[in-house]
């Protein structure tokens, strides 16, 4: 008789995805971030659900309701800080996951990669709308500045902004709809993650050598299920250290002041995980140009499969590409730092140089490095 997990229609799907899935025998800890992202999403959905039971999406009471959660709800402070820092953790894992994909050439699984880019946009939209909900100073002004960027779109721009606002400024209608979207989007993200996995399991996982691994596969369970579990435990240790000891380290002090449309904060900036894109936006002294650069800073990821010139998939044995990759990582860290600085010399020129370098490495230097390496290896 066949075992139930192999015959039952529902369990069969779980079995094929998480138990009997043939996986390469040599995938490293960089492959743990996919499962960690799943854990992050579950943390966010669960903490978000409990927060929504006590939160009110009204401009008069939103800020007070968040204070009430922290002061009066049993373990409300813990749920709130888990949710706020869970977003940061989500993006840390997300950026590591994308970096792994770039380094090891995983982007050559085009469908999986493109669904991943859509997922990135959805997560960014969700995080942005979530940041508006506490209705602090940075919530209000961040929402005003970022939504206002759409007014740079020719002809329909200003109408589009008013349509998103639901009025003539960021107000009650905006807060209400942002709450609705912020609640529904994580479930759409979960569904898209399933599609992401579906496409991945069509091809099987890549591996650090970037070579076909069909000749040497091992079952996902128990090998990688326990490896993922260890990753989750390390993640939790890191997560709860931040939540319990440094809960406000990644937040903005301005968001502890209630939103005031009559008082502009000296430096309007988004959360740390958007600062690199914000720096690219600010480095162009033209509104429409900045918005285009902002969109391209993420959309440029879609070009990776087209710009792959090397005859090897992974960067494991490609030293020139490795140097380019780590310069790109350093450049992103510099952009993140610049995004949090005021718009004044020398930060302006550093931001512009870092933005040019960002696009140059991806569009020009990495493909050239691939061609040089082919030549050196006489391929």
UniProtKB/Swiss-Prot annotation:
Cofactor note: Binds 2 heme b groups non-covalently.
Extra remark: Heme 1 (or BL or b562) is low-potential and absorbs at about 562 nm, and heme 2 (or BH or b566) is high-potential and absorbs at about 566 nm.
Record carries keyword Transport: yes
Protein's UniProt name: Cytochrome b
Subunit description: The cytochrome bc1 complex contains 11 subunits: 3 respiratory subunits (MT-CYB, CYC1 and UQCRFS1), 2 core proteins (UQCRC1 and UQCRC2) and 6 low-molecular weight proteins (UQCRH/QCR6, UQCRB/QCR7, UQCRQ/QCR8, UQCR10/QCR9, UQCR11/QCR10 and a cleavage product of UQCRFS1). This cytochrome bc1 complex then forms a dimer.
UniProt-annotated binding residues for heme b b562: 83, 182
Entry membrane topology: Multi-pass membrane protein
Cofactor(s) it depends on: heme b
A GO cellular-component term linked to this record: mitochondrial inner membrane
Compartment list: Mitochondrion inner membrane
UniProt-listed InterPro entries: Cyt_b/b6_C, Cyt_b/b6_C_sf, Cyt_b/b6_N, Cytb/b6-like_sf, Cytochrome_b, Cytochrome_b_C_euk/bac, Cytochrome_b_N_euk/bac, Di-haem_cyt_TM
Transmembrane portions of the chain: 33-53, 77-98, 113-133, 178-198, 226-246, 288-308, 320-340, 347-367
Residues the entry annotates as binding a ubiquinone: 201
Taxonomic superkingdom: Eukaryota
GO molecular function, one term: metal ion binding
Family: Belongs to the cytochrome b family.
Residues holding heme b b566: 97, 196
Family matches, as Pfam families: Cytochrom_B_C, Cytochrome_B
Keywords: Electron transport, Heme, Iron, Membrane, Metal-binding, Mitochondrion, Mitochondrion inner membrane, Respiratory chain, Transmembrane, Transmembrane helix, Transport, Ubiquinone
GO BP terms: mitochondrial electron transport, ubiquinol to cytochrome c
Gene from which the chain derives: MT-CYB
Reported function: Component of the ubiquinol-cytochrome c reductase complex (complex III or cytochrome b-c1 complex) that is part of the mitochondrial respiratory chain. The b-c1 complex mediates electron transfer from ubiquinol to cytochrome c. Contributes to the generation of a proton gradient across the mitochondrial membrane that is then used for ATP synthesis.
